[in-house]
Amino acid sequence: EPSWQDWCVDFAPPDISTDSPIDQPNAQPWLAGRRIAIARDAAFSFIYPANLDCLRSMGAELCFFSPLEGDALPPCDALWLPGGYPELHAQALHANQVLRAGIGEHVAQGKPVWAECGGMLALCEGVTGLDGNIQAMWGLLPGQVIMQNRLGGLGMQQLVLDTGLLRGHTFHYTRLETTMQVHTRSSRPGAAVQPDRGEALYVHGSVRASYFHAWFPSNPAAVAGLFGATIQA
């Protein structure tokens, strides 16, 4: 039975636990001259090496920083907050108010943010634990994250953007209660978008946020669009 990564691209990628680069299909220098800041530490650890290779293949300069270590947002043209477990580090993340202010200024300037699953959670107002206790987060997106014992989403997904179809997956134990309007939704492979199924994509200012985990090599052009490149659909 093929893995979801095999479905996500037209070729079978190598072992994603390694840092060896892979070929990127149809990648062009759409991100040349752009600097992308990427949160990477114990709170934001869900990063496929192939996704980094995809960004580099399009000419992006990558700059990593650690919210948990108290880092400020580096000078950048775009920001990626990947998945992970920020709810386990809520106190330390909330304490990094320099980073919160930097992200707020980044958004105020209209610079793009891609917040993926845990990255989206970190931007929300707070996290309600299984014990009912609320821990504050960065409060840059309206909404409260609710921890739950059962899965909130699991499986292969696709997300149709203006610049094309991205493939990926979803896996989370939380739900988001928010007043943000749903821009679109992901769907199962080959299925049509349904109003009450799949993962919501939220667009809030220059922030795009979703529980959807994107496999960047599935459509480099669509990824470039997420990070601010002008792509003709």
Segments the model singles out, each with a brief description of its role:
Residues 33, 58-60, 75-76, 109-111, ...:
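Short coil/turn connectors at secondary-structure junctions
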Residues 42-44, 69, 85-87, 120-121, ...:
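Short, glycine-/Ser/Thr-/acidic-enriched flexible segments
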Residues 62, 85-158:
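Cysteine-nucleophile active-site neighborhood
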Residues 28, 32-106:
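Phosphate-binding active sites in nucleotide-utilizing proteins
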Residues 1-35, 145-233:
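Amide-donor transfer/coupling interface in amidating biosynthetic enzymes
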Residues 51-53, 93-96, 128-131, 184-185, ...:
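Short, glycine/charged-enriched secondary-structure capping and boundary segments
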Residues 81-85, 119, 205-207:
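Short acidic (Asp/Glu) and glycine-rich catalytic loops that position anionic groups and cofactors
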Residues 37-38, 63-64, 80, 115, ...:
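Structured core elements
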